[in-house]
């Protein structure tokens, strides 16, 4: 049983995750969904303030990307001393659906990190921690995921996977509203599936198959 109202907060580091959780929660009042990062803040260069650490210390769930832009998460979880938190990485949720970043000749590399050649296995399960056990991986997930494109939410199929798995994780914390969470998630993923079908229909009917963009990062998915 959660001790106080602050612990009923679900924090998200990206608007996409915030939107998914908000759709799952619907009109239920057990949890409050909030953004950790303020409007206009660039997540690629964001570092949590002492106030942000306090927010993490008092939340019930943290949904973050799990890539090179938020390697600070592991340290923040340790500093927060929140033993009951459920920390969920989006890259872990999509698992093998995550795409490798591709270095193209002539494209400026904005995020440079050294990578080894070992294979990395991503389980399609949330980084859910048992009661009393915080995420103390010391950035292991983030370090392993550095060469994957973080913008997983740009794929509607990924959005469906994330929504369904987040709904399962939230249901684990609040079984009383489980039916409503599942119903809300199904309604939302139905809309995503319809939109994905519309995109596929448009693509199949297209006479031009080449798109010229100015930045590869947002469009890999």
Ranges and model annotations:
Residues 1-221:
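Extracytoplasmic metal-acquisition and chelation regions
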